[in-house]
Regions:
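Contiguous transmembrane helix-bundle modules in multi-pass membrane proteins
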Residues: 1-224
Length: 224
């Protein structure tokens, strides 16, 4: 949108992205020899969760890139002009993000290398029940049940409950509430804050997608 509205602003953003991404890849390449091998890991492990998560993200990125560049490629080859809009991205991107968000809530609870599936399921049962109740109750409270907003509410509360569960487990056996909170480092709290932001975003998308109301009305001076 910035490129289309203001080419000079778009150039600035392009340069900024090149600097940020270029430096990130340069730092990664510089530190690559120091990264130790991950070794073997079981199917039910945090490594597997991260691997599946990254696969979905790469596929979603590729789908978005295809939808963005495909019209330009057709135009450059003289094969006609087409427009790829919101319906394509909604149909392709949303299904890929659903498993990512679902696994995002589970991943931090899974042990590295190998985890016990039964123990993991038992931990997530309360979160699943609360999320399912929220997915049913909120649409009915809004006056109409819609399946896709309900799925969004389920995933949002799935993330919220996972965060609460992690904080509760991490603060277990602490002498005071404050000591339980301070036992975690900044990186751990950063992860929780990032997950909370995604949960809030999903909740907002679900609410807008299903229950947004927009009206055009005529107003004159003095109307309130």
């Amino acid at each position: 949108h910035a490129f289309a509205a203001d080419p000079s602003r778009g150039l600035f953003i392009l340069i900024f992205l090149c600097i940020v991404i270029g430096l990130s890849f340069a730092l990664f390449a510089w530190k690559a020899p120091e990264v130790a091998s991950g070794g073997n890991f079981a199917i039910v492990s945090r490594e597997s969760m991260l691997l599946v998560n990254n696969i979905f993200l790469v596929v979603a990125m590729s789908a978005g890139l295809l939808g963005t560049l495909y019209p330009l490629i057709l135009d450059a080859l003289g094969l006609g002009k087409i427009s790829v809009g919101a319906p394509y991205f909604d149909a392709v991107f949303a299904p890929l993000m659903l498993p990512v968000i679902f696994l995002m809530a589970i991943g931090p609870l899974v042990r590295w290398k190998e985890a016990e599936l039964g123990s993991l399921v038992r931990q997530m049962v309360p979160s699943f029940i609360v999320s399912l109740i929220a997915a049913v109750a909120i649409p009915f409270a809004m006056g109409e049940f819609k399946i896709w907003p309900a799925v969004g509410f389920f995933l949002a509360f799935w993330v919220f409950c996972s965060i609460i569960h992690e904080i509760r487990v991490g603060s277990r056996n602490a002498k005071t509430v404050s000591s339980g909170f301070l036992r975690h480092g900044r990186s751990w709290w950063g992860m929780q804050l990032a997950h909370l932001g995604i949960g809030v975003t999903v909740f907002g998308i679900a609410m807008v997608m299903g229950y947004e109301a927009e009206r055009d009305v005529r107003m004159v001076p003095g109307d309130v």
